[in-house]
């Protein structure tokens, strides 16, 4: 197999990407996987940069709009697909390989076997998108197996997803180390998201209410959980045009709200027809500096599956 590292060579077949990653591991190079659905932005590129910090790693970025994680009526068909532009960005970033399979390649027999998240997948996102995490965990498990990865990188914007992936790595004894990477935001605080392209100028301005509410809630962390929720909730309630699915304060492991210590404030809401999620770390009982100065709170610990 002829292969030139750093050129973002595109692989569409499971067999071919597997041949590459097995050969690299045999040669002593670990495999670092960055799973994405494409429509790449600076948040995704921060995952790439984190993966490139693994000494000697072969960095593989997967681009796959996974139909299994979209319910009927969601935005599967509308989800932006920009493969050529994505590959150009990844080549400029020095990524080694891109795995961009078709749905038929990934699910030749349909979704016969799925992984379900258990109780932790029934709250927050799971309460509003009950089939979502089974689709996510199934495709992530497949990508881990296909690429033989040693490391995998996920953004903290999808905080519940990150914890559930850590959960299956632990529970299924996978030999993969999962790394959480902090949220990347626009200069005005909006969390980077591929779905931001759906927003009109007016909706984008309104979407800033989410990060504003989280920041305001976190700033009163020393006053306790009730003050955090009341403050954040009042900002969301005052904004016309935002339909909130949930605003919840939970432990960093998504357990019930602690009285003090590190917690996570999470929100999901529709702005127009676009559903957005965001979250922030909240140091209950202590001060809060803001999103740009240590304000993401404690990240989930990296999870080694060995």
Curated annotation (Swiss-Prot):
Record keywords, A-Z: ATP-binding, Cytoplasm, Ligase, Nucleotide-binding, Pantothenate biosynthesis
Family of the protein in this entry: Belongs to the pantothenate synthetase family.
PANTHER family recorded: CYTIDYLATE KINASE/PANTOATE-BETA-ALANINE LIGASE, PANTOATE--BETA-ALANINE LIGASE
EC number annotated for this UniProt entry: 6.3.2.1
Active-site residues from the entry: 44
Entry annotated with the keyword ATP-binding: yes
Compartments (UniProt record): Cytoplasm
The protein, known as: Pantothenate synthetase
UniProt pathway annotation: Cofactor biosynthesis; (R)-pantothenate biosynthesis; (R)-pantothenate from (R)-pantoate and beta-alanine: step 1/1
Organism: Corynebacterium jeikeium (strain K411)
Binding site for ATP: 37-44, 155-158, 184, 192-195
GO CC term, one of those recorded: cytosol
């Amino acid at each position: 197999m002829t292969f030139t590292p750093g050129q973002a060579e595109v692989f569409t077949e499971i067999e071919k990407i597997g041949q590459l990653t097995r050969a690299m591991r045999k040669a002593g190079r670990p495999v670092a996987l960055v799973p994405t659905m494409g429509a790449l932005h600076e948040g995704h590129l921060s995952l790439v940069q984190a993966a490139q910090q693994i000494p000697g790693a072969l960095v593989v970025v997967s681009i796959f709009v996974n139909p299994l994680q979209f319910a009927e009526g969601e935005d599967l068909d509308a989800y932006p697909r920009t493969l050529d532009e994505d590959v150009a960005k990844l080549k400029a970033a020095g990524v080694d390989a891109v795995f961009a399979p078709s749905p038929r390649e990934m699910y030749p027999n349909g979704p016969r076997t799925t992984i379900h998240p258990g109780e932790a997948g029934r709250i927050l996102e799971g309460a509003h998108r009950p089939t979502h995490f089974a689709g996510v965990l199934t495709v992530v498990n497949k990508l881990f197996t296909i690429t033989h990865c040693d490391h995998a990188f996920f953004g903290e914007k999808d905080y519940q997803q990150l914890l559930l992936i850590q959960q299956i790595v632990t529970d299924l004894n996978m030999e993969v180390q999962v790394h959480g990477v902090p949220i990347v935001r626009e200069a005005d605080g909006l969390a980077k998201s591929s779905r931001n392209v759906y927003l009109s100028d007016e909706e984008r301005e309104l979407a800033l209410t989410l990060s504003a509410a989280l920041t305001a809630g976190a700033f009163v962390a020393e006053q306790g959980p009730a003050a955090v929720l009341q403050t954040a909730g009042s900002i969301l309630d005052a904004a016309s045009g935002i339909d909130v699915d949930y605003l919840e304060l939970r432990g960093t492991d998504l357990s019930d709200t602690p009285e003090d210590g590190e917690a996570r404030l999470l929100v999901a809401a529709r702005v127009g027809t676009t559903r957005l999620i965001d979250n922030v770390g909240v140091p209950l009982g202590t001060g809060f500096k803001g999103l740009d100065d240590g304000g993401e709170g404690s990240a989930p610990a990296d999870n080694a599956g060995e």
